[in-house]
């Protein structure tokens, strides 16, 4: 065998090893697959959020939420006053879900629509709307997956608390609100999520000081665990449903292969994901947080530890892209110390772009696979739903480009394939939801950048829903057509690292 042949073999083996590291199976990113490759009861759906999709912000007894105030005070671009108007068009949207072939629709309940003052009497019109939506979905064979709080706290409660989640009063108020939802809808809703992106929720709003983040998270965790206990004690046996929490997840990868960056990437995971997931496993914050946070990090009492441990039937994950992490010990010398400085690191989006300024997410399905491997190996392989995953697009682009959203198709293909590979490698993934079903008001972008499978011209009074190429692809996939992942995927090379860790 000559040297040229040896070099070619070494090169081929190197590429194969990279594919195994990234996807866990040999060259799977180039193979076809279909939904029958997934487990029999695997759920495919799409997601939304009450404030972002419903509209009717000032109708039928709904009162102001924190999102309304943030939007109308200029802290968010635009507002959700009308947005996609699903409040009035839910029947049409349910028909579109059936046409698409969704197994499930994940939506949230507007607390300020159901209980306008945050506590006290239930709004009959709000109750009627959510009953109608749930019934319409079930009539068409679509499962409702319901989130109790997608960040939009009633403004009346925020005013009373003096901040979003800094008051322990929030715990009892949330449990009382959850009780109403379980009682009124639990005979038909079998999948409940307490909080969407609980780790981001803890960051509060523009008025939340960095010193308050630990306390906010503490109250959110105790509110989740208390609502879970209520559900299990009073409802689960008869309603036979499931309850969990949702967190936002990045794949944190070290900027270099140095030991300090590898450790820093693990620390980033502990401070962002483990912050909310680890207490559900053993009733304690991650060791790195306890060490670096010191007295700033609240401690759980023995009763709270018992309450938290095992307080989930599933974990929901929202995943869009990966971030690189660099160790920065100088952060640990900054005073006063807080959640951010305690991490001792700097994290950056791949390519140093900021997707929250409208740049497309780097297409990193390998990162989703990596996160699922972490949940299997670090957190005991709990049941997981991918609750949000999707690609942002410029809503101001020309119509043909908006409708023929090839980058979104490539993004979805790659990430669904990554989920399949994770399942085959033993990850306990139960379902996948696209973000989002419709173009709608986005909290970071207004209506300038959107994620929907259906295009909506927000200047059209009829708000007509137009299927995009991504909707057609997803529908064909859900109905049995094979998909291929020969797509434009950003490789780990673009992060200048091949280090993967669990």
From Swiss-Prot:
One of its GO terms (biological process) is anthocyanin-containing compound biosynthetic process. The active site is at residues 197, 388. Keywords: Glycoprotein, Glycosyltransferase, Signal, Transferase, Vacuole. Optimum temperature is 48 degrees Celsius. Coiled coil: none annotated. Its EC number is 2.4.1.299. GO terms for cellular component: plant-type vacuole. It is an enzyme of class 2 (transferase). One of its GO terms (molecular function) is beta-glucosidase activity. Pfam families: Glyco_hydro_1. Its main location: other. It comes from the Eukaryota. It catalyses: cyanidin 3-O-beta-D-glucoside + 1-O-(trans-sinapoyl)-beta-D-glucose = cyanidin 3,5-di-O-beta-D-glucoside + (E)-sinapate. InterPro entries: Glyco_hydro_1, Glycoside_hydrolase_SF. Disruption phenotype: Petal color variations. Petals accumulate anthocyanin lacking the glucosyl moiety at the 5 position. Glycans are attached at residues 2, 303, 425. Beta-glycosidase that catalyzes the transfer of glucose moiety to anthocyanidin 3-glucoside at the 5 position. Anthocyanins are ubiquitous colored pigments that are responsible for variations in petal color. Uses acyl-glucoses, but not UDP-glucose, as the glucose donor. This is Cyanidin 3-O-glucoside 5-O-glucosyltransferase (acyl-glucose). It comes from Dianthus caryophyllus (Carnation). The lineage of its organism: Eukaryota, Viridiplantae, Streptophyta, Embryophyta, Tracheophyta. The gene is AA5GT.
């Amino acid at each position: 065998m000559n040297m040229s042949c040896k070099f070619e073999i070494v090169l081929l083996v190197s590429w194969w090893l990279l594919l195994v590291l990234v996807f866990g199976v040999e060259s799977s990113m180039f193979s076809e697959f279909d939904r029958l490759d997934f487990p029999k009861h695997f759920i495919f759906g799409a997601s939304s959020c009450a404030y972002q999709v419903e509209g009717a912000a000032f109708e039928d007894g709904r009162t102001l939420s924190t999102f309304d105030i943030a939007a109308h005070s200029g802290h968010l671009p635009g507002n959700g006053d009308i947005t996609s108007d699903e409040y009035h068009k839910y029947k049409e949207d349910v028909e579109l879900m059936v046409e698409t072939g969704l197994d499930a629709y994940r939506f949230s309940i507007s607390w300020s629509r159901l209980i306008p003052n945050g506590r006290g009497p239930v709004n009959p019109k709000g109750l009627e709307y959510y009953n109608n939506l749930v019934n319409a979905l079930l009539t068409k064979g679509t499962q409702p997956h319901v989130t109790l709080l997608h960040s939009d706290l009633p403004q009346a409660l925020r005013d009373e608390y003096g901040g979003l989640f800094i008051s322990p009063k929030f715990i009892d108020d949330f449990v009382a609100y959850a009780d109403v939802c379980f009682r009124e809808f639990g005979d038909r809703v079998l999948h409940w999520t307490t909080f969407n992106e609980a780790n981001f929720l803890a960051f509060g709003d523009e008025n939340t000081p960095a010193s308050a983040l630990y306390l906010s998270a503490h109250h959110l965790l105790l509110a989740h665990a208390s609502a879970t206990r209520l559900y299990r004690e009073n409802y689960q046996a008869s309603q036979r449903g499931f309850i969990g929490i949702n967190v936002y997840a990045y794949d944190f990868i070290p900027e270099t292969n140095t030991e300090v960056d590898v450790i820093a990437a693990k620390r980033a995971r502990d401070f962002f994901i483990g912050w909310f997931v680890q207490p559900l496993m053993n009733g304690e914050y991650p060791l790195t947080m306890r060490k670096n946070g010191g007295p700033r990090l609240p401690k759980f009492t023995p009763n709270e530890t018992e309450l938290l441990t095992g307080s989930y039937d599933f974990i929901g994950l929202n995943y869009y892209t990966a971030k690189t992490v660099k160790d920065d010990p100088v952060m640990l010398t900054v005073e006063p110390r807080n959640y951010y400085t305690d991490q001792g690191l700097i994290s950056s989006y791949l390519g140093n772009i900021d997707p929250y300024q409208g740049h497309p997410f780097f297409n990193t399905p390998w990162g989703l696979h990596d996160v699922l491997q972490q949940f299997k190996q670090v957190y005991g392989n709990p049941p997981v739903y991918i609750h949000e995953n999707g690609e942002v697009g410029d809503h101001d682009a020309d119509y043909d480009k908006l409708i023929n959203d090839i980058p979104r198709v490539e993004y979805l293909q790659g990430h669904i394939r990554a989920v399949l590979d994770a399942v085959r490698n033993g990850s306990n993934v139960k379902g996948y939801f696209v973000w989002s079903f419709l173009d709608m008001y986005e909290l970071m972008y207004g209506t300038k950048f959107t994620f929907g499978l259906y295009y909506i011209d927000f200047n059209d009074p009829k708000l007509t829903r137009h299927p995009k190429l991504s909707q057609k692809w997803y529908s064909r996939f859900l109905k049995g057509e094979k998909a291929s992942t020969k797509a434009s995927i950003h490789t780990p090379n673009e992060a200048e690292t091949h280090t993967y860790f669990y």
